[in-house]
Amino acid sequence: MDAKRQRGPGLTPLSSLDALFLHLESPEMPMHVAGLHLFEMPARRRHLYVDDVRRLFAARLQLAPAFRRRLAPMPFDVANPLWIDDGAVDLEHHVQRRVLPKPGTRAQLHALVARLHAQPLDRARPLWQAFVIEGLASGEVAVYTKIHHAAVDGSAGVALAAALMDLEPMPVPRLPKPHAVDSVSDAGEPTVTQRL
């Protein structure tokens, strides 16, 4: 079945390859992809940095359909699940704060990220999480993000990162264009996943 064809309002079937990522997942082999980014801590911060990150995600959710969709399993698993728009994404769950114990070494950061990466994503929610990690001895803040491979392929992951991060200190206003494509995968050229 064509992965772009809709099965009702807001329902999009998973491709066979994307569904395979769900079926192959096990506790020993999570099927999410992840990134770890280090940022300079903003000067004169008056509130928790995680609140800024949540506001950023909230402002840009409309640019990233993969962050809004959750799985809708088919009855008796007779077919691949569908993606359905979650409506109200719980950013308290999806964007969490962690603080490293002193001294806040890179080894401690890597150990924490390894533990977070080993935890499976909740399939009843959109298949992603972000963790704002403070307490690094360098004064930096780390942001670890993970998203299920069923939700994005490589090119869609790059598009998600571009939708969320700015390359300049002053963010560029991003407003959705009328009748804009829903995602990079809807922009006309098939993604790697769709070509397989």
Regions found by a protein language model. Give the residues of each.
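Non-catalytic N-terminal regions of enzymes
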Residues: M1-L196
